[in-house]
Amino acid sequence: MQTLGHHYHALVIGSHGAIGRALLEAITADPNCALATGLSRATHAGFELTDEASMAQAAESLKADAPFDLIIDATGALTIDGHGPEKTLGALDAAKLQRSFEINAIGPALLIKHFAPLLAKERSLYAKLSARVGSISDNHKGGWYGYRASKAALNMFLQTAAIEIQRKRPQAVVVALQPGTVASSLSGPFAGGHDVITPEVSTEGLLQTLDATEAKPGAQFLDYRGQTITW
C-alpha cells in the first residue's frame, strides 16, 4: 500500500476466514504497515456479528491501536446454519432470511457504527467485502434471494454511512468490494461455472484496488480487478 504513507495502521475484521486471513497476512508483510491487527472470534473471545455489545467491547479494546488508516470487514456468509441460498420463491423462509440479513447486512452495519470512529482523520479506507450478486441492476439470473437481498441492503448501508463519515473525514474512502469467486468453504459448493481464484490472488487485487481508489462522495462498488460494479 503506497497511498496510506509509511507506518500506517490496519485492522482486518473477520481475519479467521480464508480471505480475511490472506488479507491480514499480506498487510502484515507490507513494509509500509506499522501495525496490522486481526479481529475475529479467535482473537477476541465472545466476538459475534449478532451481538452488538461484543462489537462495542472489541472496538473499545482496540482504541489503543487507533487511529486506523485501513479497516477491512471481511465477514459474511453464503451458507448459514447449514442452509444454502434459495433458488425459488417457494424456498423462502422467514427465519432463514432473517439470519442472512443478520450476518450479511445488520452485523456489518453495526461494525461500521462502532469502528468507523476509529478511522484516521486524513486519508483512510473503510472497505467491506460485498458481492456482485448484491447489484440490483446486474441481476439477470434471479435466485439466491436472501443472499442477494442482504448484500443489496449492505450496499445501501455502506452508501449511507459513507455520506455521514465523509462529513467529518472528507478524505475517507468507503468501498464495497467484490473479491471474485475465491476458493473457500463459502464458495466451494457454488463455484461451478465461475473462474475460481485463490485467496492470495483475490487479496493482491483487492489491496491494489484499494491503494488506487481516490476519495469520492459516497461509497464505491469495485471488484478485485478495480472495475466499477453498478449498484
Language-model features: where?
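N-terminal Rossmann NAD(P)H-binding glycine-rich loop of SDR-like oxidoreductase domains
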Residues: 13-29
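Conserved active-site helix of classical SDR/Rossmann-fold NAD(P)-dependent CH-OH oxidoreductases
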Residues: 25, 109, 152-163, 200-207
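Rossmann-fold cofactor-recognition segment
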Residues: 39-57, 62
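A glycine-rich helix->loop->beta "capping" turn
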Residues: 61-75, 80
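Catalytic loop of short-chain dehydrogenase/reductase
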Residues: 77-81, 85-101, 123-159, 163-168
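Hydrophobic positions on the long internal alpha-helix
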Residues: 111-115, 119, 157-158
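C-terminal helical subdomain
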Residues: 172, 176, 184, 189-231
